[in-house]
From Swiss-Prot:
Signals that turn on the gene: Expression is growth phase dependent and sensitive to the media conditions reaching high levels in stationary phase (at protein level). It is probably regulated by the CpxRA two-component regulatory system.
Similarity-based family: Belongs to the SrkA/RdoA protein kinase family.
UniProt-recorded name of the protein: Serine/threonine protein kinase RdoA
Binding positions (Mg(2+)): 206, 217
GO MF term set: ATP binding; magnesium ion binding; protein serine kinase activity; protein serine/threonine kinase activity
Chain's role: A protein kinase that (auto)phosphorylates on Ser and Thr residues, probably involved in the extracytoplasmic stress response. Probably acts to suppress the effects of stress linked to accumulation of reactive oxygen species.
Length: 328
């Protein structure tokens, strides 16, 4: 069974509690599901009133070696005093198994939502991203992939071609817009950037604030350019994004060098994320959680909007990239 066909319907509460009991943890509260579609994540409290989070990984998405690399990276970051949510070890192992599922247990870490429009918080995030990347540069991932065109563009293009859920009246226009976008990204893409281990999905929703930033969810960690962990923090118009990026880079460079030439990768990376995310939704459609939570995916209007989004992103790729002020 591949990861596209898999569902979590056999992951019952009793199965979860049995898995935790095997590690010496008695659940003394209910299992509260947290927002995660790719995996299944639950918060709970044990009999000593300690709070934990347990994460059950979607089978076949990542190999055991790839998940262990993610965990090792998180533990390295903690050792280097970078604030991340890292898995706990049981008998020396962070990746655990029960009834065919792989899972990990984390301490439950509370915090407020990171405020992307707060300049002080943005500076702190930039500084800690510099430290995170210092650790990331020590060595690359061996088993986890690099960010590249095949995974983020060409494989999704085939998913779109094969997808039965795209309305027939919209498919031709959508595929045409996709092909035009892919060509534009390919023209802009560079492979001469330095790569390092990244958080990979560093947006505001994966940063908590507790007297400073706390990075969570390294599930998408990959090798790639440093800018991948910066651009998703930007929002607003170009002037606002320029100010935000300058704030991040200035703080980042207090602890780590940043190649400003990578700024030209922001819009190609944005396009790649748009394409990859849409293909991900289609791939996961067999999981009942997806039709339930994304019912609009089969609608004509939705695919019209996606076609327009791809056309607009293609236009942006033909414009000059974001420019920093001359002091940079």
């Amino acid at each position: 069974m591949n990861d596209n066909a898999f569902t979590f319907q056999t992951l019952h509460p009793e199965t979860i509690m049995d898995a935790l009991f095997e590690q010496g943890i008695m659940v003394d509260s209910g299992l509260t599901p947290l927002n995660s579609y790719e995996n299944r994540v639950y918060q709970f409290q044990d009999e000593d009133r300690r709070r934990f989070v347990v994460k059950f990984y979607r089978p076949e998405r990542w190999s055991v070696d790839q998940i262990r690399e993610e965990h090792q990276f998180a533990l390295e970051l903690v050792k280097d005093e970078v604030p991340v949510a890292a898995p706990l070890a049981f008998n020396g192992q962070t990746l655990l198994a029960h009834q065919g599922y792989h899972y990990a247990i984390f301490p439950s870490v509370g915090g407020r939502q990171f405020e992307a429009d707060n300049i002080d918080q943005m500076e702190a995030v930039g500084r800690y991203l510099g430290r995170l990347h210092q650790t990331g540069r020590k060595r690359p991932f061996t088993f986890r992939p690099d960010i590249g065109l095949a995974e983020y563009l060409f494989e999704p293009r085939q998913v779109f071609e094969d997808a039965a859920l795209i309305p027939s009246g919209q498919k031709a226009a959508f595929l045409k817009a996709t092909d035009t976008l892919l060509s534009a990204v390919t023209e802009c893409w560079r492979t001469d950037f330095a790569t390092l281990r990244l958080h990979g999905d560093c947006h505001a929703g994966n940063i908590l604030w507790r007297d400073g930033p706390l990075f969570v969810d390294l599930d998408d960690a990959r090798n790639g350019p440093a800018i991948q962990d910066l651009w998703m923090l930007l929002n607003g118009d170009k002037a606002e994004q320029r100010m935000q990026l300058e704030t991040i880079i200035e703080a980042y460079e207090e602890v780590s060098e940043f190649d400003t030439a990578e700024i030209g990768l922001i819009e190609p990376l944005r396009a790649m994320r748009l394409v990859y995310y849409l293909a991900w939704l289609i791939r996961r459609w067999g999981d009942p959680a997806f039709p339930k939570n994304f019912p609009w995916l089969t609608g004509e209007d939705y695919w019209q909007r996606q076609t327009t989004t791809f056309i607009e992103q293609t236009k942006i790729l033909h414009e000059p990239p974001l420019q920093l002020t001359p002091m940079y």
